[in-house]
From Swiss-Prot:
<dbReference type="GO" id="GO:0042149">
    <property type="term" value="P:cellular response to glucose starvation"/>
</dbReference>
<dbReference type="GO" id="GO:0043491">
    <property type="term" value="P:phosphatidylinositol 3-kinase/protein kinase B signal transduction"/>
</dbReference>
<comment type="function">
    <text>Required for both basal and inducible autophagy. Determines the localization of the autophagy-specific PI3-kinase complex. Plays a role in autophagosome formation and MAP1LC3/LC3 conjugation to phosphatidylethanolamine. Promotes BECN1 translocation from the trans-Golgi network to autophagosomes. Enhances PIK3C3 activity in a BECN1-dependent manner. Essential for the autophagy-dependent phosphorylation of BECN1. Stimulates the phosphorylation of BECN1, but suppresses the phosphorylation PIK3C3 by AMPK.</text>
</comment>
<feature type="region of interest" description="Disordered">
    <location>
        <begin position="411"/>
        <end position="473"/>
    </location>
</feature>
<dbReference type="GO" id="GO:0034045">
    <property type="term" value="C:phagophore assembly site membrane"/>
</dbReference>
<dbReference type="GO" id="GO:0045022">
    <property type="term" value="P:early endosome to late endosome transport"/>
</dbReference>
<keyword id="KW-0072">Autophagy</keyword>
<dbReference type="GO" id="GO:0000423">
    <property type="term" value="P:mitophagy"/>
</dbReference>
<dbReference type="GO" id="GO:0097632">
    <property type="term" value="C:extrinsic component of phagophore assembly site membrane"/>
</dbReference>
<keyword id="KW-0472">Membrane</keyword>
<dbReference type="GO" id="GO:0051607">
    <property type="term" value="P:defense response to virus"/>
</dbReference>
<dbReference type="GO" id="GO:0061635">
    <property type="term" value="P:regulation of protein complex stability"/>
</dbReference>
<feature type="modified residue" description="Phosphothreonine">
    <location>
        <position position="429"/>
    </location>
</feature>
<dbReference type="GO" id="GO:0045087">
    <property type="term" value="P:innate immune response"/>
</dbReference>
<dbReference type="GO" id="GO:0035014">
    <property type="term" value="F:phosphatidylinositol 3-kinase regulator activity"/>
</dbReference>
<protein>
    <recommendedName>
        <fullName>Beclin 1-associated autophagy-related key regulator</fullName>
    </recommendedName>
</protein>
<dbReference type="GO" id="GO:0001934">
    <property type="term" value="P:positive regulation of protein phosphorylation"/>
</dbReference>
Length: 492
């Protein structure tokens, strides 16, 4: 191999052993090439155009060194040494990695231990909180158990109370049913007793009967006296006389002027049609004629006596039935003399209203009632054939029947009284809704025979002595009412 200088022989030194002699063939090749200088040929090793060259064989085998003598170590030796160093580096790296792997594992274990400690601490705190909550829940559970036990005991007591109340309610229901049955029977007995008293009252003291009259129709009389009136006018007057306004309509009344209703005897009666013109005429004649009235059969006396008896009967019946009348009417309202037309009409209207009120309370068939027929309505009320006579309980008055009362002699409403003492307003005698219904006193039986009515007293009155008989009957009726009242207060 040629040396880097190109002249003379050069023996490289092996690393660690000093200079080393060149091989004989390498020396020969170098000697042979000493005189060759190629200007354009480049060195395959350093890629320069220096004149000193190295052969390809030496380059391929790595058998060359620096030509300037800086390092005597061949390339192949360096390569081997580099390989050895790399191997040592790899061994050192493996040892370092092995040593670091233990450290890494130690750090990982330390980190895991620290994480586990933190987690254990958190778990301890969680367990502590859980224990506290469990303790609280246990205390709450105990309280709830005690509360539930109390509620259960209370529910048991309430159940016992409920069963006791149910038994009590059943007993009360049976008692109420029994009391209701007893009350119904009591009402039935009371109705029978009231019915008995009313029938005794109407059969003994205030008997009523229908009396046929033989008088002619005033329309016929007027037709005979007034020749100017035609037959058609007479027939119209007769037809108008036989009609009555009832329940919002005009109805025909066949018994308008043919009959009259008597009370306490056939000599005391009222016209069936409610015509009190005889009383009005007598009052007018009384004003013009001075002196005592010698006519005992005067219709005015019989009308006033019949209305007075009817008033007494209505008041007694309302007392027996325990019903407050809507209109306050005294028994002596018709006993005075010279009653004006307006005052008499107002009193009759109140009497009719009271009678209709009593009829409604006893469920009398309203189709049989007419506002002008005072005694006939009263007969329907106290009739023995009335099924509900003596009943107790609520009732309702028909509005059309009340409205029909307003048409009773409407012309009288516009008239004014001459005397100031006769101006009696309806408010003074009205028993409307302003009156408070006080509870009735303790029920007591009215004696069935409170007054002994002798046959002589019932036969003393005679038709020729009408005025004295009327006064005697009024006094006897008043005495009977007084005796009933004394017997009633005596039982209290």
């Amino acid at each position: 191999m040629a040396s880097p200088s190109g002249k003379g022989s050069w023996t490289p030194e092996a690393p660690g052993f000093g200079p080393r002699a060149l091989a004989p063939d390498l020396v020969d090749s170098v000697d042979d090439a000493e005189g060759l200088y190629v200007a354009v040929e480049r060195c395959p090793l350093c890629n320069t155009t220096r004149r000193r060259l190295t052969c390809a064989k030496c380059v391929q085998s790595g058998d060359f060194v620096y030509f300037d003598g800086r390092d005597r170590e061949r390339f192949i030796d360096k390569k081997e040494r580099l390989s050895q160093l790399k191997n040592k580096q790899e061994e050192f790296q493996k040892e370092v990695l092995k040593a670091m792997e233990g450290k890494r594992l130690t750090d990982q274990l330390r980190w895991k231990i620290m994480s586990c400690k933190m987690r254990i601490e958190q778990l301890k705190q969680t367990i502590c909180k859980g224990n506290e909550e469990m303790k609280k829940n246990s205390e709450g559970l105990l309280k709830n158990k005690e509360k539930n036990q109390k509620l259960y005991s209370r529910a048991q007591r309430h159940q016992e109370k409920k069963e006791k109340i149910q038994r009590h309610n059943r007993k009360l229901g049976d008692l109420v049913e029994k009391k209701t049955s007893d009350l119904r029977e009591h009402y039935d007995r009371l109705a029978c007793l009231r019915r008995l008293h009313i029938l005794e009252l109407t059969s003994v003291i205030f008997p009523m009967d229908e009396v046929k009259t033989s008088g002619r129709d005033p329309a016929d009389v007027s037709s005979e006296t007034d020749s100017a009136m035609t037959s058609s006018m007479v027939s119209k007057l007769a037809e108008a006389r036989r009609t009555t306004y009832l329940s919002g309509r005009w109805v025909c009344d066949d018994h308008n002027g043919d009959t009259s209703i008597s009370i306490t005897g056939p000599w005391i009666s009222l016209p069936n049609n409610g015509d009190y013109s005889a009383y009005y005429n007598w009052v007018e004649e009384k004003k013009t004629t001075q002196g005592p009235d010698m006519e005992h059969n005067n219709p005015a006396y019989t009308i006033s006596a019949a209305l007075g008896y009817a008033t007494q009967l209505v008041n007694i019946v309302s007392h027996i039935l325990d019903i407050n009348l809507p209109k306050k009417l005294c028994n002596s309202e018709f006993c005075g003399e010279n009653l004006s037309k307006q005052r008499l009409t107002r009193a009759v209207r109140k009497l009719n209203a009271n009678i209709l009120y009593l009829c409604s309370s006893q469920h009398v068939n309203l189709d049989q009632l007419q506002p002008l027929h005072t005694l006939r309505n009263l007969m329907h009320l106290v009739s023995p054939h009335s099924e509900h006579l003596g009943r107790s309980g609520p009732f309702e008055v028909r509005a059309d029947l009340e409205e029909s009362m307003e048409f009773v002699d409407p012309g009288v409403a516009g008239e004014s009284d001459v005397s100031g003492d006769e101006r009696v307003s309806d408010e003074e005698t009205d028993l409307g809704t302003d009156w408070e219904n006080l509870p009735s006193p303790r029920f007591c039986d009215i004696p069935s025979q409170p007054v002994e009515v002798s046959q002589s007293q019932s036969t003393q009155a005679s038709p020729p002595i009408a005025s004295s008989s009327a006064g005697g009957m009024i006094s006897s009726a008043a005495a009977s009412v007084t005796s009933w009242f004394k017997a009633y207060t005596g039982h209290r």
